[in-house]
Amino acid sequence: MINTSPLLNYVSSHHDIKAINQWRTDVEKQLQDSYENGQSIREIIKARSDLVDEALVFLWKHAELDQSKLGLFAVGGYGRREMLPYSDVDIMILSEDEISEENEKRISTFISSLWDVGNFKPGISVRTIQSCVEQAATDLTVATTLIEARLITGNTQLAKWPRRIVSQTWTDKTFYDAKMAEQAKRYHQHNNTESNLEPDIKNAPGGIRDINQIGWIAKRHFRVNRIYDLVHLGFISEFELAVLEEAESFLWEIRHHLHRLAKRDENRLLFDHQREIAAKFGYVRQEGQPVNYGVEQFMKRYYRTAQQVSTLNEMLLAYFSESVITPRLPNYERKIEVVNDHFKIVDNKLAVQHHKIFAEHPSAILELFYILANRPDIEGIRARTLRLLILAAKRINQSYRDNPEHQALFMSIIRSPYRLYDTLVAMKRYGVLGNYIPAFGQIMGLMQYDLFHIYTVDAHTLLLLRNLNRFREPEFAKEFPVVSSVFQRLARQDIVFIAALFHDIAKGRGGDHSELGAEDAIEFGRAHGFTERECKLIAWLIQNHLLMSLTAQKKDISDPDVVKDFAEKLGDMEHLDYLYTLTVADINATNPKLWNTWRASLMRQLYTHARDVIRTGLGRPVDYQMLIEDTKFAASELLVNNFALADVEKVWQELGDEYFIKESADEIAWHTQAILKHGDNPEPLVLLRAHRKAAQDAVQIFIYTRDQPNLFATTVAVLDRMNLDVQDAKIITASTAFSLDTYVVLDRFGTLLTDPEREETVKNALVKALSQPDQYPGLMQRRIPRQLRHFDIENTVDVTLNEALQQNMVEISTLDHPGLLARVGGLFMMQGLDIHSARIATLGERAEDIFFVTKKDGKPLNNEEVKLFSEKLKAALDEASNQICQH
């Protein structure tokens, strides 16, 4: 029992209605105290609804509506007695006939008093029975609210009418079809997934609306008031009801905290609130645990809960359709096809032959999915079969996993050429995959608290498998021509499938997830018929699944030594082919924004160069002189028809060997042609073109100008102002004191090369800034994205010496924010450092950038200078991060 102050203690007379404000404030505090003292959320929200009833009854009488024949109904969540702190108070005033002028005045007084009181957020409709009929017939929302309309006070004869109206205006089928279409639209608005990074816990798949949906459809047909009443009718089991009620209470508690923190009706579990709400549920990081452990465990519970809710929603509503709606259709005849002794296909859905199949033949659990994987014409699983399957999945134990028949069935599913992804998603959804591979069950719902990994680990893993499977399909071969060709010639595609399944399976355990996952995979592989050599290959792929992406992202792959070192780690073409397919599929399954033609070109270049090294022999040293001569010859072939070779050589002799080692013949010819045409023009030369190896979304910008101290800082500041994101930079200083700079940029608007006016604007901005070296453009003030303010990222600076280049390599990891590169470039300028090249990577909210620098005299920093510079750069990054958090 929750003790709250009686309203009459505050309103001694009907003229004192504004005292209701104070009463509501006081009882709200009493409700919160009760909640904090252990009262269930279910009791709290019901008590709040009852208190609102009490206030409305008082105001109804205050307006003298108790003397009318009108009825006051609670609708929506209020009608279900589900009131959160800032929920709307949705009410309907119902009349049998046209409302008299006197009653209209009373209603006006009542509505005014609701607004005068102030703490209510009323949503009010005033209807006659006839207008209800007319509106319900054409408006699904009106019909839905009528199903759960609850009489608060007034004419009791009206209590039966709301549901009666829905029965008159909608059949079981029309209402079901309309609500399912509405749900499909709602799902689409939330990306058809339960695991959005900032989920709407009310409306997203697996949210409160999914539970409401079951109630609306079932209550309309069975004429019951509570979902609990459906147990006695056999529509839902006691176990299923318990799961739904536990999930509902958890979701209500989250909403309760969201309302309190936001001080409004908030349903989105934003990054702003996730960590604080996690702590309220007791998910707090302990000493020694990762910094985001608490919030990630809380979100894991949420995602698992949402998965349970959406699965029950799917199953129960399918059961309603199959048991109530379909058999009533005119001229209905079931289409039945016998598959074998265990299964049949009924109306295009798979069903068991009898209800004891899974108990008597446990292998049928996996057999069902083998049939689904190999019969694309089957549309799903019958609801009764699904109910049996979900229960049977709980009986999968070690003895089941060790059965050779079951192991063979599982591998047959993995090797299915048709719809592997859909089948594995179903196996996960219905509890089979997580029970058959317990380690997979541990990562279900596990999120990583960042903007880089936008899927839970289990969802990401299955998307990776989907991507691999797509490399078989002609329509995706156009999008991924090289990797599709490589994948299709793999001797054993199931090897990379198992590597994909286990590559992240040890996340969340602590320790190196690649090493732990490799151990799990070896054990699994041995049990499932892989040879020792194949198991070692699977383990190697898992241990090295980040090798290729990190090499392409963080190293200069135009450097032959970098490629040679990478190729030596692989050893042969088999390892390269498997790793390439796994890496491309992995990147595409992490974040759709991560993959673009620039990154694709990096991966393709690294694969091609490594392939050439492996084919010509790993033991052979790089012949730099031959490489330079070959590149010069190829470039001169592109220039010979338009320029005298003597003029070409004059330009080239000012450039060092490194230029001809790292630039392609095509780019050298482009640069040389531009320089020769530019002649003695004192203005900086700026050219733009589509990146030849990366298509339209990557743009090359070539700058030829007199060398100056702030060249990089000025350039990146201008590019940031032009909404261009730098991905790569190469700065070559000729012996004539001219600088040849090549930038690869991604255009935030995607119009740079199709809009001549914008292209000219970018060129002019660069020319103007570079012509005035003393006027360094200030950093542009941009709005910091809301999401960035909630990530606690440690800023790191690592400065090492590259012996071969005699340059310092500066690696920074920091919170990405607008103007970061320009800020860093300005600091390099102030410290008197020249940047020779840069590799820029943005991974969600994190920036991981690498710069190669020297002092003005061309020498690297010494140890003391490195220490001093590192401290200054770290301090600058810390200051920038603090400013972001304070905004």
UniProtKB/Swiss-Prot annotation:
Residues 1-337 are annotated as: Uridylyltransferase. Residues 339-699 are annotated as: Uridylyl-removing. PROSITE patterns: ACT (PS51671), HD (PS51831). Residues 700-782, 809-887 form the ACT domain. NCBIfam families: UTase_glnD (TIGR01693). Modifies, by uridylylation and deuridylylation, the PII regulatory proteins (GlnB and homologs), in response to the nitrogen status of the cell that GlnD senses through the glutamine level. Under low glutamine levels, catalyzes the conversion of the PII proteins and UTP to PII-UMP and PPi, while under higher glutamine levels, GlnD hydrolyzes PII-UMP to PII and UMP (deuridylylation). Thus, controls uridylylation state and activity of the PII proteins, and plays an important role in the regulation of nitrogen assimilation and metabolism. Belongs to the GlnD family. This is Bifunctional uridylyltransferase/uridylyl-removing enzyme. The gene is glnD.
